[in-house]
């Protein structure tokens, strides 16, 4: 059966058929690939799941706890009252010791330097231990007479060889 210009159905059904096939190619809706299925308390990747999965409390709760343990806020430290400015920082003991040592030595006018490493210093090379006597001659020989292999080319023209001859 051939299609005739006066017949209905064939040309109009072709675009519909193409649209139907295109819709069949579209994937079915599914859950987001980045969400954890284990439990609703886990966050998605968009909310840093790897960092927050181990926490049992809300991040807002532990942020409040950290803020309370840190002492006065930064705007309180700018106040002219000496008690607010001299509030101790909550640093590890070894950091506080280093800070106090640096502060005492800078008040005394002593320059502060980092401690030297326990490794012994490497000896410096002295000029007489370096031998450059044959370096210039080898360089001149390599430049003036390059290694060639005349048999490598069928035309008989010399070619640079990969190794010294």
Swiss-Prot record:
It comes from the Eukaryota. Keywords: Cleavage on pair of basic residues, Glycoprotein, Neuropeptide, Proteoglycan, Secreted, Signal. Glycans are attached at residue 133. Residues 106-165 are annotated as: Disordered. Detected in cerebrospinal fluid and urine (at protein level). Detected at high levels in the substantia nigra, fetal kidney and trachea; at lower levels in testis, uterus, ovary and placenta. Not detectable in many regions of the central nervous system. Also detected at high levels in lymphoblastic leukemia and colorectal adenocarcinoma. Pfam families: NPBW. This is Neuropeptide W. It comes from Homo sapiens (Human).
């Amino acid at each position: 059966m051939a299609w005739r210009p006066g017949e209905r159905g064939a040309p109009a059904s072709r675009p519909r058929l193409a649209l139907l096939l295109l819709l069949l190619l579209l994937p079915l809706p599914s859950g987001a690939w980045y969400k954890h299925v284990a439990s609703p308390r886990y966050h998605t990747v968009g909310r840093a799941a790897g960092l927050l999965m181990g926490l049992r409390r809300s991040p807002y709760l532990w942020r409040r706890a950290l803020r309370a343990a840190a002492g006065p806020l930064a705007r309180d430290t700018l106040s002219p009252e000496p008690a607010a400015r001299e509030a101790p920082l909550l640093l590890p003991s070894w950091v506080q010791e280093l800070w106090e040592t640096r502060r005492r030595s800078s008040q005394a006018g002593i320059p502060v330097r980092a401690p030297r490493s326990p490794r012994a210093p490497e000896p410096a090379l002295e000029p007489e231990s370096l031998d450059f006597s044959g370096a210039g001659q080898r360089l001149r020989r390599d430049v003036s007479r390059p290694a060639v292999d005349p048999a490598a080319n069928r035309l008989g023209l010399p070619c640079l060889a990969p190794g010294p001859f």
